[in-house]
Each structure stands twice: as structure tokens, then as C-alpha cells.
Amino acid sequence: MKTSGASNTDELNKSSHSKVSKKSTKSRSKSAKLELTGKNSLSASASSSIASAVSGGVAVGSLPATPTHLNMVTTPTTPTSSLGNYNLFDASFAVAGSGGHGLAGGIAGAEASGNSSRMGHQKSYAGFDPRSIKIFWEQHDQTDVELSQDVCARLAEDASYKVWELINNVKIYSRHSGGVVTYDLVNEVLKDADVPPMLGAMDSDWDRIDYDGSFYFHSDKIFELSAEFQKEVNLCTPDDADFQSICPVEDKHMDQLRQCVQSLVTAALFADSKSQTAAVCHAFQTPLMGSIYRVIVSKMVQLLAFKQQDHLSQRCWRLLRACNYNATANHNACRPEYFNLAEVLVSQLMAPYETIKAPHVDPDPGQTTSIKMEFEEELKVEPDQCHNPETQENPEVMGVEKQEQEPQMFPGESTMEHTIYKLQSEEEELNPQPEAEHLSSYFACPVGNGLVDELCETIGQLASQSGYLHAECLFLIKRRLARFFEGRHVSSERDFRYISRAVRGLIALGEYAFREFIPYIYKLRVEEIPDSLWPDLAPAAIFLGGHDDVYLYEWLEYGCGAALQPFLVHYARAYEKMVTRRYVKAKQPAYRIESVPGVRRLEWSTLAAAMCHGDDPSKALKPKPTLCEAFPDLQSPNLQLNCAGNIRFKFAGCRPVLLKPKVATVPHSEDSPSSAANGGGGGGASSDILIAKRKLFKPLTNVRKWSPISGYHYLRI
């Protein structure tokens, strides 16, 4: 194998030094082989050094600044350079250390060289400097001929691009091999790039395994670069991952915006009806809403929490809906305000969480001394007051009590006691620390029953615009429902009114939120549910969606009856989807008319016939051929033998067909009753048997006919 660099060097020597004798050329080429070997080793080592510097991995190969094991003959150079006493590797590494000529010093060298005016406006990269190429030339040439600066610059640029290409190919090849770089892989890259596989040729530490007369091949060594391709990428997501928009405000407009907010809130809440309507319309369409939305929401939270008035709450809800409908308020960054607003709105719907009292059911007399009850007041006790020294000194007492009360936990006992009692095992902590929940400090009193619908409308509108507010409202409602149903036997009218408020709030939040109420359905007895609760549950039929909801449908239909029909939109949606699918997939109607074989000729007029043959009667048109002339092999059927045509069948679509006689495989005896019954004809008597065969006709069009049972009235869950 011969290197392209070697051939180019020989061509340059031949072209620029034509006066040199062949003898000196041969002697120089013999010593230049080892020097080219060193040059290729330098290129490979330098390329691997750049690869390690760029990728941050382990260097593929690096040589010390002062090599001590160079198996090459150093050729003395002409004293045209200050580094004439160094060989190839000494010069390259020494210049690289000085930062002016080497591979690593290409950035600074580009500015210091004569080519800095051309490279000054370009981005600097690590590469060869023209003076480095000049050093290479001086070490491989024994004459005083010097290369021009333009030739050195062009060679430096080409060599840098070649090294960059090799490094990039090594990285790509190693990525496909799991991040492992080997000599074999790099040699494969060099082979594909038309460069001799010389990596590691000057490293005498390795065992040489082959020598083809020009190059040495060494045993393979593995270097790990998997850390480069298997890095852990840390993506820092902010706390508020929602898509948000911020409307910046200049300082000189702050006073005007404050006055705008104050005037808008005053007019919408405390003015007459005409001014309230004008303020709401202004809030709906003002382009400044993106800048003042957070301030308005904060004021509404304060008014709803501290002004416990129903008419004022109605006006606040109305203003909130108008501001939320404004397009500039969408996706506004106001999570802290929504956090407090959700607590206030849910408190107005279902009362504050602390006001929900779980009923205290007295246990049986035999259980009073052995079962630890979770009273409502225990939630307010400090953790240091929960220590029981007797329990700490004798931890086996609770274990014995647990064993004594185990039979009470079976399904045969009352489920109510199973819910409100908790046995403390010895594995549990004696003073468990409950997880601190981040809850809002705002609260409000529940509004009247007549305002629940408008409140649910407000919650649904705000939640549909903000996913964060939707999640907060759903969490707060679920938290209150869990506490309400904890050990409670729902039987009073007040309890069902509370459930009605919760259901209406969940329906306002959507299908996903309402399905959180389904587990609590099993805790309600259908016979005890009053008639006033069923109308509030009827709108939930909107969320019915197929066979999976059949039990929920039956439960709702049992109590709601015909009131459920207006909300069964699943039927209409399914029918609309079916009709749309048929319309989209409908084909253009095409009629099939089957061809009838026969001989047909157009009727010519007398004038046309006269113009065709003229006065020559031999050219006159011949008469139409008959059917027998057109089809000489045609045999007309004998209608006398077709006795089946005389039998009239009364079955639609059926016609009589003669059954062909079958040859009897078993000969019948002459006195056989079957042969006598069939007229003595044996198997030939079966020709009198007729069967009815229906002739199926294909439709005339390709338009599919749908059965009428697939209409709207026939759809069912």
C-alpha cells in the first residue's frame, strides 16, 4: 500500500527539483519512507488528540513531548528554521507547546502568521498552521528551496480539513460500535478515507503482528469512549411547567393601570346595573387584561374570602368570568392567585375542610377498652402530646389488643366500624408525623343553594381555561368527599344536599372529575336517595360512553328515568360519527349493465347505401346474417323435453331444475321394491325428481344499502 501523501511529495520533489540527480532522489526516497511513516503516525496521533479534546473522551493515542523510543532514522535538515536540531515529532510537539505552530496552537498561530489578515474575520478552529507545513517541508527536503506562503496556507487548510474529517468519521464509527474505539476501527476509517492504516505504527510498546514491506501493523488495543455517547443529560424543568404568557408593563404606565383596576373593580361590583354591564363588557374586550389579570384575581380572592355576601359573590363571579373570557388573559402566569382562588371557590361550594365533622359512632361496650379511636380532635393535638409512656414501656399491649379484636374486622361485622376504627400495630410509630400538606390559608362560607349553579358555572369556566386550577379544584373536592364519607352513614337530607353540591361541582369540572365520584356511589343506598338529588345527577349522563358504563347507566336510569334522555348524547354522537363515516367513504354510484351477446348492425339509409356502392349492384349491402349463420354451431334447445318449465313454483326467486340421472353403482334386483316403485327404471327414474334452485341477481349499482335497524332510535349502550 502506498500513501497518497507520499506520491504527492514525490511529485512535488520531481517538479520543483528537476536538476537533482536520480541517485540522490533514490537515496532520499529510501530514508523518506520512515519519515513518512512518522508523518502518518503524527497525523493519526494528532487526529486522535483532537478527537479526545473535542469529545471529552480518552485520547486514542498521544506521544510525549520528548519521545524516547522512536524507531526511525532522523534526517538532518537545512538550517532554515530555528528548530533544525529537532526531528519531526520534537518539532511538532515543541511548537504545539509554544502555541505558535503546532496542531493545538493553530488558533493563536493563525493570528500571528502572515495569513492572519485572511483568517481574521473567520471563526477560529484548531488546525494546522502554515508555518507547521513549512516545518514539515524543511524536514522532508534537503535543498534550500522554500515553499511560498500561499502554498503552505493551502496545504495547511487541506490537511486540517482532512484531519477533521478523519476525527468525525472515527466518532461516527465508534458510535455504531457502542462507544468503543479500537485500532481496527481507526484503521478501517483510514482505509475508507484512502489513508494508510498507520495508527500506532511508531508505538514500540505494542507487539507488531504484520509487516507488508512498507508499513507495520500492530495488535489491537481498546479505548473506551462510551462516556461520550452515554452521558446523562439533565433537563431542568421549572416548577410551573404550564405554558404561560407574561405581559410586561413599563414603569411609567403603572399608575394608570392601578387606576384602571380600581375603577374597573369598583364599577363592576358597587355601581348601578348599567355601569356594571359596561364594566363587564370592558373587561371582556380590553387589550390591557393581560397586564392587570393577576391583580384583578387577587382582589377577587380577597373580596370573596372577607366579604361574605351572596350578591357581592355573584358580581365577583361575573367579573371573573368576563376577565377569563378575554383572549389576552389566556395562559397568564398566575399560579399563586389560582391556588388561593380554588380554595375560596370550593369553600363556597362545599364549606371549609375543617368544618366537615365525621360522626362519632359509639362502639360496643366490649370494644371500648381495646380499640383506639381516631377522634376528630386528634387532628389538632400537638405531636409531643401524643406520647404515651405506658405504651412505650409495654409495647406488647397493643399487639395483644390487636389479636383480640381481629375477629371484628371480618366482613360479617359492621362495615361502619371497620371504617372508623383503626388498630395500631406494634410496627407502626407511636407518634406518626402526618405529611405537611401545602394548603391555602384562605377560606369562605358556603353560599346559598340558589347560587350553586352559577358558582359551578364559574368553576367550570375557569377550570377549562387553566389546567392548574382544574387540578386544584378537583383535589380539594376529592379531599372533602373523602372526609365526608369517612365512617358516615348518609341518611339525612342535609347530607344529600352536600353530596348534590359536590356532584354538581364535579360535573362542572368535566368527565374525568365526575368519575372520581363513582366509588362513592357504592356507599349510597338507592332506596334512601331523595328525589331532589336525582335531577342533579341526570346531567352526568353526558359522560356515558359505551358498554363500559352500562352499570352507571342503569344506576342513573333507575333514579332519573325519562329525565336522563336529554343528556344521552352518546347516541347522537355515535350516530353522527356513523353518518359521517358513511359520507366520507361513499362511492360514486355506477350502474352495471351486463352485455347481451348478439349480432347487430346499424340501419343504413337508402341514400347512404347508394353513396356507398354507387350504381354497381355487386357492391350493395348484404342483408343481416341470421342467428344460425352467425353461430353455425348453435343448437336450439328442445323445449318439449324441458318438462320442468310446465311446473309452476310459488316460491319467489326459485325455478325448477331437472335433476340429472345418476348411474346406479349397485345393480338393483328386478323384484326390488324400490325399483318397482320407481317404475322399473332403476337409477333412471330419478329424472322425474325436481329441485328448486334460486337464482341470485347482482345489484345494478355498487352503492351499499344499509339496513334500517342502524338508525338513531335503534342505538343502545
Curated annotation (Swiss-Prot):
It is found in: Nucleus; Chromosome. CDD domains: HFD_TAF6L (cd22932). GO terms for cellular component: nucleus; SAGA complex; SAGA-type complex; SLIK (SAGA-like) complex; transcription factor TFIID complex. GO terms for molecular function: protein heterodimerization activity; RNA polymerase II general transcription initiation factor activity; transcription coactivator activity. InterPro entries: TAF6 (IPR037796). Keywords: Chromosome, Nucleus, Transcription, Transcription regulation. GO terms for biological process: positive regulation of transcription by RNA polymerase II; RNA polymerase II preinitiation complex assembly. Disruption phenotype: Larval lethal during 2nd instar stage. RNAi-mediated knockdown in female germ line cells results in arrested oogenesis at stage 6-7. Residues 123-204 are annotated as: Sufficient for interaction with Taf9. PANTHER family: TRANSCRIPTION INITIATION FACTOR TFIID SUBUNIT 6. Belongs to the TAF6 family. Component of the transcription regulatory complex SAGA, a multiprotein complex that activates transcription by remodeling chromatin and mediating histone acetylation and deubiquitination. The SAGA complex predominantly acetylates histone H3. Involved in SAGA complex coactivator function but not essential for SAGA complex assembly, histone-modifying activity or chromosomal recruitment. Required for oogenesis; involved in transcriptional activation. This is SAGA factor-like TAF6. It comes from Drosophila melanogaster.
